[in-house]
Amino acid sequence: MIDLKLLRENPDVVRESQRIRGEDPALVDQLLEADEKRREAIKSADDLRAEHKAFGKKISQASPEERPALLEGSNELKSRVKAAEEAEAEALAKVNEIQMLFGNVVTDAPAGGEDDYIVLEHVGTPRTFDFEPKDHLDLGESLGLIDVKRGTKVGGARFYYLTGDGAFLQLGMLNLAAQKARENGFQLMIPPVLVRPEVMSGTGFLGAHSDEIYYLERDDLYLVGTSEVALAGYHQDEIIDLSDGPIKYAGWSSCFRREAGSYGKDTRGILRVHQFDKLEMFVYCKPEEAVAQHQALLNMEREMLAAVEVPYRIIDVAGGDLGSSAARKFDTEAWIPTQNTYRELTSTSNCTTFQARRLRTRYRDESGKAHTAATLNGTLATTRWLVAILENNQQADGSVIVPEALRPFVGKEVLEPKK
């Protein structure tokens, strides 16, 4: 939810953000008009309440002869107060309705759509193979790590089993991420994967991409596509203590996505699936700390990608490709040899005060005044990392070298083909 104070003081900033996102700038004027009507309705209701209160004092001081007429006037005024309060509530509802149509105000992101990102950095050099590399599914099947056929039999398209060392490889990766998170001051959590509509809406996931979310109609609950949702809802309607610095959580959960808009895309293997596991970082901080925290999350992603030994690049995502809650987002993309391209492994977003304003999460400054907090999120490990790990570390004999950082968890240095 955007800041109405920012809207009033800098409407052109919000208009430009709408243009960068590819959204309608005319919404700015609609919201300004609705906000003005809301403020007028508040003043009108406040004035009538004050008048009614003064009238009550006059009645208490009136003589018995004067009271009947004054009581009649008081009742009439009471009706006017009720009508004014209804108008006030209606005006507020209209403001909220229009406000919910806005994405976050874009900050420093490049203009354009999905293909207009800016590459900020390349790390590592894509490997030159002296043999024809296999894709992750061929490797996963020959090594006994991935079973898509039985996953499809049981759950349908885009489901799979991780088996044997494949399960240990994922658990090792997630455990390594959890350790790194704890070393960097994050509190590990295993949060709910089902959340109420107000939490899903509060995080900005019930907008244009709501068809990507699984909804349990009988229970009025949503399955999360990321633990970001549950971690953002953790402090809903609370005033949190940021006097000792940011509050940092790392959520380990299964995640669920319908992939409704992805028909025909990445149907092979486990790159784009309906269920996967992920360790997600989430930070609450003061708004002025958010940019630095965003870089800190990106640096942790860098460390983790270095640990699993894959070449990658970092991109600055264009405004038109941002989710509604993000003011700016960096993606890290790993090199996938058999696709001859980079594919997204992680993202980290600065959501400024957008989510916390919707979820009413605040903190107090040194004077005791309450302010809306800022929130940020970033992925530290997830199932699709296995795609990059397997393909980049394969050998000519069909084996895969386990990255050194994962060997204590997997218990092997090399994964050998099953005979």
UniProtKB/Swiss-Prot annotation:
One of its GO terms (biological process) is seryl-tRNA aminoacylation. Its EC number is 6.1.1.11. This is Serine--tRNA ligase. Pfam families: Seryl_tRNA_N (PF02403), tRNA-synt_2b (PF00587). It catalyses: tRNA(Ser) + L-serine + ATP = L-seryl-tRNA(Ser) + AMP + diphosphate + H(+); tRNA(Sec) + L-serine + ATP = L-seryl-tRNA(Sec) + AMP + diphosphate + H(+). Catalyzes the attachment of serine to tRNA(Ser). Is also able to aminoacylate tRNA(Sec) with serine, to form the misacylated tRNA L-seryl-tRNA(Sec), which will be further converted into selenocysteinyl-tRNA(Sec). It is an enzyme of class 6 (ligase). NCBIfam families: serS. One of its GO terms (cellular component) is cytoplasm. The keyword Magnesium does not apply. The gene is serS. Gene3D superfamilies: Bira Bifunctional Protein, Domain 2, Serine-tRNA synthetase, tRNA binding domain. Belongs to the class-II aminoacyl-tRNA synthetase family. Type-1 seryl-tRNA synthetase subfamily. ATP binds at residues 257-259, 273, 344-347. Consists of two distinct domains, a catalytic core and a N-terminal extension that is involved in tRNA binding. InterPro entries: aa-tRNA-synt_IIb, aa-tRNA-synth_II, aa-tRNA-synth_II/BPL/LPL, Ser-tRNA-ligase_type_1, Ser-tRNA-synth_1_N, SerRS_1_N_sf, SerRS_core, tRNA-bd_arm. The keyword Nucleotide-binding applies. PROSITE patterns: AA_TRNA_LIGASE_II (PS50862). Its main location: cytoplasm.
